[in-house]
A protein has these predicted regions:
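Extended basic (Lys/Arg/His-rich) segments that typically form rRNA-contacting surfaces
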Residues: 5-234
Length: 234
């Protein structure tokens, strides 16, 4: 998502990065409840994000596109490939476990080593959260595709079977038929979730609703590409 931000002269380098950045990396901590001033309870996901480090700045002249590469999470040198380790040594940065890129039209205003913290988002902002769904191994059609089971009485013997696969005339199973198989362990995006609270001191975001993945799983939080920002309650 491109930013149409115009650089003001009064902002510091960190503030400039915070203004243009639309992505931050972190991990899921779990779920809890928060109460509004009127007593309304909200189920929220607690996400620990940042501080992330700008590990590389891509420009139109050198790379053919404008983007910022972020790194998050410490990792031992021996667990990185030599090309990755060389990139960090050249930049003078500590190795990071996760790296992701975000395309920005004003990426050239950032430099390697700049930090991105959770206060790039404010209360009421809409975000898209990307995580890896929990792996559930082999699952049948009821759990995997929400099929209804068959009757359990009057001698019925196909309670959880998938049912007919195709007609006799076709003589084969059509590609794409929903059947049992591996379920989970896939990339999932939860869109247009509202930021309920920002705890900059502890690098925490409280996001309304559920987020894909297990606790301590790696996630990405970015500005929502669709949806309209909701108005704050008076």
């Amino acid at each position: 998502m491109e930013s149409h931000w115009v650089e003001p002269e009064s902002l510091s380098t960190h503030e400039k990065v915070q203004e243009i950045m639309t992505l931050i990396l972190g991990r899921k901590r779990g779920m809890t409840q928060l109460f509004d001033a009127d007593g309304t309870v909200h189920g929220v996901t607690v996400v620990e994000v940042g501080p992330c480090v700008v590990t590389q700045v891509r420009t139109q002249e050198k790379d053919g596109y404008d983007a910022i590469q972020l790194g998050w999470g410490d990792i031992a040198d021996k667990r990185l490939a030599k090309p990755q380790l060389g990139q960090y040594k050249k930049a003078g940065l500590a190795p990071k476990r996760f790296m992701r890129e975000e395309r920005l039209s004003v990426a050239a205003t950032c430099k390697v080593g700049d930090t991105v913290t959770c206060d790039i988002f404010k209360e009421g902002d809409l975000v898209d959260v990307v995580g890896t769904m929990k792996g559930r191994g082999f699952a049948g059609t009821i759990k995997r595709h929400n099929f209804h089971r068959g009757p359990e009485t009057h001698g019925c013997m196909n309670v959880r079977q998938p049912g007919s696969l195709a007609s006799k005339r076709i003589g084969k199973v059509i590609k794409g038929k929903r059947l049992g198989g591996h379920y989970g362990d896939t990339r999932e995006t939860s869109k247009n979730l509202r930021v309920v609270r920002v705890d900059a001191a502890r690098n925490l975001l409280y996001i309304k609703g559920s987020v894909a993945g297990a606790n301590n799983g790696f996630i990405q939080v970015r500005t929502a590409k669709t949806g309209v920002r909701q108005k704050a309650k008076a």
